[in-house]
């Protein structure tokens, strides 16, 4: 049946075996493999084509016959060797003794996977046939496209089937084999429409025309034009076959005899003999074309397949590293495992305070948050200083009325200066405490994220760490608040080194003088205005001087607070929190009886780790297969 020469035949089987081996490993769960998917409308002759290729009877009948994807693996044996069959699905595998049992075994498999009815399932049934009469070829047969639901079928059975077909044919690695009866208008065939949607350029679509004996007289030339690629152009083209009809099945015409009848039909046909002569007709020619096409497709796909396997291996290793190792079963090893987990977490907590790279919690950086918050605090101090200065300038008269005592004009009362300075600085206290609480929440959030990264899959251990983090945060926040309030009590002493204050005062006076010069330039002052200014200067000299002193001192105090408040917050909420967290978590290790509870793993995490481990193993095997190919 196979007309390939010996030299090429030696190349065919290894190529197809390679992909079959990868598929049997389950690699198709991870990436798309080169394949040929067979699709067609119901009663298009799809089963007949597969029967003719495989030499065994497959489920037939009206309605949905193929209810699960059927992987048909055909292996050509040497002349004289015995027929061999095997069916496998899910975790079940069974050898088939005689070809006559194949149909029954497929029906049994479909019933187990899709139920005893008319439902469909996505799971693959694998049928392996080895015989001298089959080509080296692997096909995946998909359910026939149903237009309307019948009997006990779900109303959306058509949509279900289309979704299943789409899952296979949309992959760029799949050659779409579309079966269309000759007596149907090819342009309206649902199967071809679906193939064109995913392959608009016809790069990977091959059409098989069936039932040529049912072609109406006068339309033969149209069929010939279609096969010659003159109606709907497809790069892989068209083939035409004549398989056993129902009459021949009833008459028990054997498949080998049907092949001979097909050959005679095309050779003797008044119109279709040209298709036979061109190599576009008969099942053997189809088998040859498919085998050659699949091998060529596999060879072209191998480089990309190798790349995909390497990419998937890298991703899988990263996932396994993220989930970490599962807890050991030995009690002594469990304690070591727990100690390592906790130690790694606390060391990362310390690293957070120094900005070093973490083992867990990639991307966590508390300093970006601290820097932003502290910059806001500094900006807030500057903004309030500007408001304070403008308010003093605006309310000079009110300040004189409120604070001036028995002193004569031009005398500065230190008590007045002190009261105003204290009043302004006191307003900053609650703002500093609010900043503390904001930063405390942000730091706690980072520590919790670190705990989640470190204790993935161990909910009890994570809960214990989060409890400790929350407790330490509240305790240190209280301590930090006390320190901040003490700082503000000290600020009410109104103090600065003489040299520092004198320097600030000189700078401020120069700024004020320059501002007056700038405002006076270009203005013409009348005699009355001049007298008014003199009077104002005499009347408010004290407050003008006081304003300069207040601005100078506020600058010193705000600079001090701009540094001191962040230092207190960082020391208590970050440095001390990390050290105390390390101490508290190490105390957890002292209670050895609770290690069992702490290491109780989340079921989902354990199953995901196992799944990733299985994926890693099959990808490693797949890479080895490709390397050895």
From Swiss-Prot:
Domain Dynamin-type G: 30-303
GO biological process: defense response to virus; receptor internalization; synaptic vesicle budding from presynaptic endocytic zone membrane
Cross-referenced InterPro entries: Dynamin, Dynamin_GTPase, Dynamin_GTPase_CS, Dynamin_N, Dynamin_stalk, G_DYNAMIN_dom, GED, GED_dom
GO molecular function: GTP binding; GTPase activity; microtubule binding
Keywords, sorted A to Z: Cytoplasm, GTP-binding, Nucleotide-binding
Protein location: Cytoplasm
Boundaries of every GED domain copy: 543-629
Coiled coil: none
Domain of life of the organism encoding this protein: Eukaryota
Region (G1 motif) residue spans: 40-47
Region of interest (G4 motif), ranges: 210-213
Region annotated G2 motif, chain positions: 65-67
UniProt keyword annotation of Cytoplasm present: yes
Cellular compartments per GO CC: cytoplasm; microtubule; nucleus; plasma membrane; presynapse
Region G3 motif, annotated ranges: 141-144
Residue ranges, annotated region (Disordered): 504-523
Alphabetical list of CDD domains matching this protein: DLP_1 (cd08771)
Region called G5 motif, residue ranges: 242-245
PROSITE patterns: G_DYNAMIN_1, G_DYNAMIN_2, GED
Induction comment from the UniProt entry of this chain: By interferons.
Annotated PANTHER family: DYNAMIN, INTERFERON-INDUCED GTP-BINDING PROTEIN MX-RELATED
Family assignment from sequence similarity: Belongs to the TRAFAC class dynamin-like GTPase superfamily. Dynamin/Fzo/YdjA family.
Protein name: Interferon-induced GTP-binding protein Mx
Organism: Larimichthys crocea
The encoding gene: mx
């Amino acid at each position: 049946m196979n007309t390939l020469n010996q030299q090429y035949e030696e190349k065919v089987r290894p190529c197809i075996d390679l992909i079959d081996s990868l598929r049997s490993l389950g690699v198709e769960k991870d990436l798309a493999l080169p394949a040929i998917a067979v699709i067609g409308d119901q009663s298009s002759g799809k089963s007949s084509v597969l029967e003719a290729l495989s030499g065994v009877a497959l489920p037939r009948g009206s309605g949905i016959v193929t209810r699960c994807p059927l992987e048909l693996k055909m292996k050509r044996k040497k002349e004289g060797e015995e027929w061999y069959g095997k069916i496998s699905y899910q975790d079940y595998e069974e050898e088939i003794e005689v070809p006559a049992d194949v149909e029954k075994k497929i029906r049994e498999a479909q019933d187990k996977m899709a139920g005893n009815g008319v439902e469909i399932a996505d799971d693959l049934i694998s049928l392996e046939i080895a015989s001298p009469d089959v080509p080296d070829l692997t096909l995946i047969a998909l359910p026939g496209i149903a237009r309307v639901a019948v009997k006990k079928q779900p109303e959306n059975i058509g949509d279900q089937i289309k979704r299943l077909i789409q899952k296979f044919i949309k992959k760029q690695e799949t050659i779409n084999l579309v079966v269309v009866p000759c007596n149907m208008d090819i342009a309206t065939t649902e199967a071809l429409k679906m193939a064109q949607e995913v392959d608009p350029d016809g790069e990977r679509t091959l059409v098989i025309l069936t039932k040529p004996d049912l072609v109406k007289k006068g339309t033969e030339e149209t069929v010939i034009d279609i096969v010659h690629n003159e109606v709907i152009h497809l790069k892989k083209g068209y083939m035409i076959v004549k398989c056993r009809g129902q009459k021949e099945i009833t008459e028990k015409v054997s498949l080998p005899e049907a092949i001979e009848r097909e050959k005679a039909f095309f050779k003797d046909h008044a119109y279709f003999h040209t298709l036979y002569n061109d190599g576009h007709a008969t099942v053997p020619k189809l088998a040859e074309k498919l085998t050659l096409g699949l091998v060529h497709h596999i060879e072209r796909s191998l480089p990309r397949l190798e790349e995909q396997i390497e990419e998937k291996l890298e991703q899988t290793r990263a996932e396994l590293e993220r989930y970490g190792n599962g807890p050991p079963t030995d009690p002594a090893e469990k304690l070591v495992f727990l100690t390592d987990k906790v130690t790694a977490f606390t060391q990362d907590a310390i690293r957070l305070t120094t900005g070093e790279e973490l083992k867990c919690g990639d991307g966590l950086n508390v300093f970006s948050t601290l820097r932003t918050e502290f910059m806001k605090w500094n900006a807030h101090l500057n903004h309030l200083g500007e408001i304070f200065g403008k308010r003093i300038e605006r309310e000079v008269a009110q300040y004189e009325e409120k604070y001036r005592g028995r002193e004569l004009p031009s005398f500065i009362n230190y008590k007045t200066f002190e009261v105003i300075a204290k009043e302004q600085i006191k307003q900053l206290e609650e703002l500093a405490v609010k900043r503390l609480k904001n930063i405390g929440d942000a730091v706690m959030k980072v520590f919790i994220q670190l705990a989640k990264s470190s204790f993935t899959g161990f909910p009890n251990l994570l809960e214990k760490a989060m409890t400790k983090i929350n407790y330490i945060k509240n305790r240190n926040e209280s301590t930090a608040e006390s320190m901040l309030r003490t700082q503000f009590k000290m600020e009410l002493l109104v103090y600065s080194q003489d040299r520092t204050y004198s320097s600030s005062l000189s700078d401020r006076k120069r700024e004020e003088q320059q501002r007056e010069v700038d405002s006076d330039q270009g203005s013409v002052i009348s005699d009355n205005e001049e007298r008014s200014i003199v009077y104002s200067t005499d009347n408010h000299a004290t407050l003008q001087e006081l304003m300069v002193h207040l601005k100078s001192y506020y600058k010193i105090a705000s600079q001090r607070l701009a540094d001191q408040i962040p230092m207190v917050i960082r020391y208590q909420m970050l440095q001390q929190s990390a050290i105390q967290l390390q101490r508290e978590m190490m105390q957890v290790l002292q209670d050895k009886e609770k290690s069992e509870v702490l290491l109780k793993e989340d079921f989902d995490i354990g199953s995901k780790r196992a799944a990733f481990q299985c994926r890693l193993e099959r990808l490693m095997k797949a890479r080895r297969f490709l390397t050895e190919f």
